Amino acid sequence: MINQLIANIKKTGAPIVVGLDPMLKYIPEHIQKKAFAEFGETLEGAAEAIWQFNKEIVDKTYDLIPAVKPQIAMYEQFGIPGLVAFKKTVDYCKAKGLVVIGDIKRGDIGSTSSAYAVGHIGKVQVGSKTYAPFDEDFVTVNPYLGSDGVNPFIDVCKEEKKGLFILVKTSNPSSGEFQDQMIDGRPLYELVGEKVAQWGEDCMGDEYSYIGAVVGATYPEMGKVLRKVMPKSYILVPGYGAQGGKGKDLVHFFNEDGLGAIVNSSRGIIAAYKQEKYANYGEEAFADAS
């Protein structure tokens, strides 16, 4: 799947992933009104609104971008109907030729980790039949539990030709409370980066490993170091825009071939119509603004 992601990036010339992280406050009133008229002010109504919102954005952007990244928490907050909207979004994006990164940040051990992996990027056996429950192309994984937590995901990736982005240095301000702790003179995030590179050695696509890393745009100097630590790992870069990451800092995350990273933008794209410079589009044309 890493080969497909790179092919999509080369085709579009845009190393961008759109974060499909819908909140009701981002969704134009006319979409909410229509959904609530059909389903009431219910979880089902909210889920219908976010599904229709996502669908319109994807329809307007799918030929401009290589990938999308739905954050599952934004769907889980609406319960089972929200998860149905998540699945519909994943399927629709894949049908449009987009690579889907499920931002699930799972982390556990043994059979629990295997179940997470099977549920999101693998297949589950039900009697004589098999099903791919959510069927994303990549997922994000929390490595805090070590190899016991990550290896079950890697095993499924090998079987299904899928991929991972493992949290290494996250974009949030308090990430340093743990990630910057020094161990034998080196920060923990660097040691995690080395482990990601090691995990990726046996998981190569044509040019890059399908075991990637998450490194925040808010820490460009650390990104520069980690780029060297993980030369064959694709880096998913959150934190650009609303979280403070600057465009000039993004160069550190790429290799000299112009590849090696994909930059996430969520509200900057899906809620573009709320920005002053795109306000002329109005709520009705929100997807055109995106």
Residue ranges of predicted features:
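C-terminal functional extensions of proteins
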Residues: G260-S290
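Conserved, mostly hydrophobic/aromatic
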Residues: V18, V68, D103, V139, ...
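N-terminal active-site wall of soluble small-molecule enzyme domains
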Residues: L64-P66, P70-G127, A132, M222
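A C-terminal functional module that forms or caps the active site or interfaces directly
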Residues: A217-N264, G268-A272
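Conserved anion-binding
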Residues: I104, D108-I211
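Short, well-ordered coil/turn segments that N-cap beta-strands
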Residues: T12-I16, D63-P66, K96-L98, F134-D137, ...
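Acidic (Asp/Glu)-rich catalytic clusters
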Residues: V58-I65, Y92-A95, I154-E159, R227-M230, ...
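N-terminal glycine-rich anion-binding loop in soluble enzyme alpha/beta folds
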Residues: M1-K60
